[in-house]
Amino acid sequence: AWGWQSAFIAAGVLGFIWVIFWLRMPKNSRVKLAEESAALAQAEKEEARASIPWRKLLAYRQSWSLILVRFLTDPIWWFFLFWLPDFFSKHFGYNIKESALPLIVIYALVTVLSILGGTLTKFLANRGWSLNKVRKISMLVFACCVVPVIFVQYFDMWTIVAVLGLAGGAHQAWSASVYTLGSDMFPKSDVASITGLSGMAGQIGSVLFQTAVGFTLSWFAAQGNASHGYDIIFMVCGSAYLAAFVIFSLIIPNINMVAPRER
């Protein structure tokens, strides 16, 4: 009733409200866990150390493992965000302007399942598994949860909604693991740099992939079979995470902090 602009305005207003709760520094907060207080105190005791220059970061295999992982998988999330309305229109003749229920359900599932992904990592860690095993088993599970999107052409609409919701939630859980890998392999003074560097790679990959998606769909539309273009694209989406997992595992057989001699 208020137009699409109202969605952005509402989100912005809620964002400013949320900022109010973050104006106070953590050490001044009255609501704080003992573990958090101890971590903050320890961080303040650590001596400041110069970060690794960006150009030197590129010499480390740990850096390239994260760069390649995000280059391959970040684009899939942006595909899910941008192209799904067009997919439902092409595949089912669904008019998203009349009802956005499928998309609402998908993103609601993403929200819930992304949180559950963190419980898996915590569960494995509580069993006494090594960091390497916890991270890689979790990433493998999340990667496998995206694989079913390869077969969307064989599913009915609501099965596709469930599959895409699972895939989106798995991506968010995957991303959380990838972000954490930066702090697993680099000292805290370098985490921001490696996160920014790998994030840049992810966005470059996203631009290239969305452009390729557009050209692919246009070509198949010209052949009179626009929905078949999506079949190919979903095959790429479903295999990207497993490919990224294999590449990461080959580059980083064991997840460890960068050794002093490597710095």
Where are these regions (language model features)?
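Helix-loop-helix hairpin linking two adjacent transmembrane segments in secondary transporters
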Residues: 1-30
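Multi-pass alpha-helical transporter architecture, strongest
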Residues: 18-25, 149-154, 235-263
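Juxtamembrane intracellular "pre-TM" segments in multi-pass secondary transporters
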Residues: 31-67, 91
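Intrinsic disorder in cytosolic terminal tails and internal cytosolic loops
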Residues: 32-49, 129-132, 251-263
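Extracytoplasmic gate region of multi-pass secondary transporters
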Residues: 60-117, 167, 171-180, 206-214
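A late C-terminal transmembrane helix in Major Facilitator Superfamily
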Residues: 114, 183-222
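C-terminal transmembrane helical hairpin of 12-TM major facilitator-type secondary transporters
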Residues: 132-178
